[in-house]
C-alpha cells in the first residue's frame, strides 16, 4: 500500500503541473497566479540569485588575475606580466636551482571613521627554467604596471657519447 501511495503522489503532481497552463506559462498575470506558481517563482529566483553570486565571484577573480605572456626568441626568453597597483618594493623575483620564483604582495590597512578596511592582493608564480637559461644574467624591470623578466639564453654544447667499457 505504501509503495502505491509513493507512486501515486508524484503522478498527481505531474498531472497538475502539466495540465495547468498558468503554471507552465511564464507570461502570466501575477494577480491570477496560483500558489504553486508562486512557489515555483520563488525557487527560480533563489536559483538565479545563487547563479549570479557565483557569476559575480568568477568575474571578480578573472578581473583581478595576473595576466602573463611567455615569449621565446633566439637569444632570450621574455616573461611579461600585468601587475597593476604593485610597485617594485612589493614584487620579488628570485632564482633557486632551476626554478624562478615571482611573488607580489600588497597589504594595506585603512582606518575609516568607524571601521577598518583591509586590502590584500598577492600572487605567486613558480616557473621551471630551461637548461639553456643563463641564470647569472636574468634581469627584470617594472614600468607602468608591466613586469618584464629577461632570461638570456646560452648555447648548450651537446656532450659526445662515449662508450663505457664493461669489466
From Swiss-Prot:
Decide whether keyword Heme is in the record. no
Q: Which GO terms describe its biological process?
A: protein refolding; response to heat
**One of the record's GO cellular component terms:** cytoplasm
Ranges for domain sHSP come to: 59-167
GO MF, any single term: unfolded protein binding
Q: Which superkingdom is the protein from? A: Bacteria
Query: Using the chain's own numbering, where are the disulfide bonds?
Result: none
Family (UniProt): Belongs to the small heat shock protein (HSP20) family.
Q: What protein does this entry describe?
A: Small heat shock protein C1
Q: Which organism is it from?
A: Rickettsia conorii (strain ATCC VR-613 / Malish 7)
The gene is hspC1
Amino acid at each position: 500500500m505504501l509503495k502505491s501511495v509513493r507512486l501515486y503522489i508524484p503522478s498527481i503532481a505531474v498531472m497538475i503541473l502539466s495540465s495547468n497552463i498558468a503554471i507552465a506559462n511564464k507570461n502570466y498575470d501575477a494577480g491570477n497566479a496560483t500558489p504553486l506558481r508562486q512557489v515555483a517563482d520563488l525557487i527560480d529566483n533563489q536559483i538565479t540569485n545563487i547563479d549570479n553570486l557565483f557569476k559575480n565571484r568568477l568575474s571578480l577573480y578573472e578581473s583581478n588575475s595576473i595576466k602573463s605572456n611567455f615569449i621565446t626568441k633566439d637569444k632570450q626568453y621574455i616573461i611579461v606580466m600585468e601587475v597593476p597597483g604593485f610597485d617594485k618594493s612589493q614584487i620579488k623575483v628570485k632564482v633557486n636551482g632551476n626554478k624562478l620564483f615571482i611573488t607580489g604582495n600588497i597589504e594595506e590597512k585603512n582606518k575609516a571613521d568607524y571601521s577598518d578596511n583591509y586590502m590584500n592582493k598577492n600572487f605567486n608564480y613558480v616557473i621551471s627554467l630551461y637548461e639553456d637559461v643563463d641564470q647569472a644574467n636574468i634581469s627584470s624591470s617594472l614600468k607602468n604596471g608591466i613586469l618584464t623578466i629577461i632570461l638570456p639564453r646560452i648555447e648548450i654544447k651537446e656532450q659526445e657519447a662515449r662508450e663505457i667499457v664493461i669489466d
